[in-house]
Amino acid sequence: EISLGLVGSEMCIRDSQETMRYFGSLDEEEWNANLAMRWKWNDTSHLKLGFNYKDKNRDYSATRFYYNLNKLNPVITDIYNTDGFLNQQNIADGQIVVQRVMQPKDSYRAGNEIYSAYLLTDFYPTEALLVNLGLRYEMSKQWVRYASDGGDWYSRRRNLDKNDLFPALNLKYAVNPTNSIRFSASRTVTRPSFIEMAPFLYQESYGSAQIRGNEELQNGYNYNFDLRYERFGKDGDMLSVTGYFKYLDSPIERIQDLQGGATLHSFKNADNGMAAGVELEMRKRLVKDLRLGANISYMYTNVKLPQSGAYTNKERSLQGASPILANADLTYSPRFGEDRQLNLALLYNLQGSRIHAVGVSGLGDVTQQTLHTLNFSAGYSLNKHFNLKLQVNDLLNLSLIHISEPTRPRLI
């Protein structure tokens, strides 16, 4: 507290956490290797065998600087003249001390190594039907090293090692030269990111919630089914309708909880969930060099939660999934000679209301409200080697609003 000489009933409260300065150092490297072989047995059919290797490593550490004002106790005659007490002279005299803090729990190291092999083939059993079959094997080794509260640097380690098979099937049936039907089925994986898996406390932006990763996270697996109708017109015009269904095994969700009286965001695997929806997409040439594109989708999601879990709402949609999504773009691309071209684009996006963080232990869900964004981009190609680009994002400049449901009372 700093007393005020003229108005003794008011106080300036020191909040070392809010005035703290935070610096993060991230060192990350990634190595990739690919090898593929292809055999053709006729003009339209082939077999492909491939191998992939990926090794990604991260080293992150944080340093905090705190202002220690314990020795500073001036009488302030002008609250608007902060230079009278927050100045270099008081720092030199030791009245204000800047403390540099590096703690083991503020650092982590993480890595992910993936060995994979795949086999795929394209062939035409009939003239109108294209079949694409694939099978991928992956051996992944993901790990994170960190320190618990009061522990030594990188003293704890969590491993997430998996061996998985990912089959895929894609069918395309050409009804006629302008109409086709596609069907696809696949199994895919959602791995926790390093920041989701590392039990490291951080903030995404000033004033936002504290976030801590969860070292107990497991992979999420997705079973995807899509059916799509496409119609192609002249000048690149296109219309498509897609229906899809996804079964989600152990999806990763962002949650919010109470720890030490403060709200803390983290991540957790739900039991399972599903998503089903329909999407409409079109591209249309309006006049020469002017095109309009748009797509809109509706999606229904549902999550099954553990019976004995601490989730506040037992029935809800999937975290992060918007039921309504829409995009539209208007592009103008005239050419001036062989190399010069102007590209102007106006891009609109609508993202419906969605759960930003799932509430547990009586805390309500945090919902992100519907968001509209409008971006503009311009580019001009002088020749094959030089381009000028301009990008202006968020022309509408609307607020991103999060609303938290009321906390439910708990009986103790």
Segments predicted by a language model, with ranges:
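Gram-negative outer-membrane beta-barrel transporters
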Residues: 35, 244-247, 266-355
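Transmembrane beta-strands of outer-membrane beta-barrel pores
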Residues: 25, 29, 53-59, 137-143, ...
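Single conserved hydrophobic/aromatic residue that forms the stacking wall/gate
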Residues: 2-8, 12-13, 401-412
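Signature of Gram-negative outer-membrane beta-barrel scaffolds
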Residues: 20, 36, 40, 44-176, ...
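Residue-level signature of outer-membrane beta-barrel architecture
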Residues: 39-41, 119-125, 129, 163, ...
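Repeated loop/turn-to-beta-strand initiation elements of outer-membrane beta-barrel proteins
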Residues: 44-47, 128-131, 178-181, 235-239, ...
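Membrane-embedded beta-barrel scaffold of Gram-negative outer-membrane proteins
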Residues: 181-182, 190, 216-268, 274
